[in-house]
Amino acid sequence: MRDLLAMRTYFSERKIDFVDWKIENGEDAIDIRKAINPDIVFYTQPYHGVYHHKHCFLNFTDRLLCYYPYAFLQIQDKYIYDQVYNNIAWKIYLANDYSRDDARMLARNKGRNVVVVGYPSSDLYQNVKLPEAWKDDNHSRKRLIWAPHFTVA
């Protein structure tokens, strides 16, 4: 709720138009069709229960639906690539060729709607020349690999 209020303040102070979802205090959620009647609808989390039922993607199947995942996809699983949304969306924007290939292999529509666009929060690491942290010709430093989420067997 604090974030919602902060966003309202930010946009209002700068006189930037925005659509207020008005979801607090038991208010009925805004009817997107009546308020802005969009031609294209973007989702970052097209899952049931994330949005108000009025904003579910199933209510907009007559519009161009787009999906840009909220998180970096790392799991090769039908659950990630073969939901109803994945198969009916007009465009699915994925971070890399690996994710595109997973969609081609796992989705019923064979990933025909996938476009590889990169992942903005990690794009800054592309083509960056970093110093060679592991190079130590004199073997003067010990190295420790800290990987608490992985098992080395």
What is the predicted role of each segment?
Residues 120-153:
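Conserved catalytic-core segment of nucleotide-activated headgroup transferases in glycan assembly
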Residues 1-126:
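Active-site and donor-binding regions of nucleotide-sugar-utilizing enzymes
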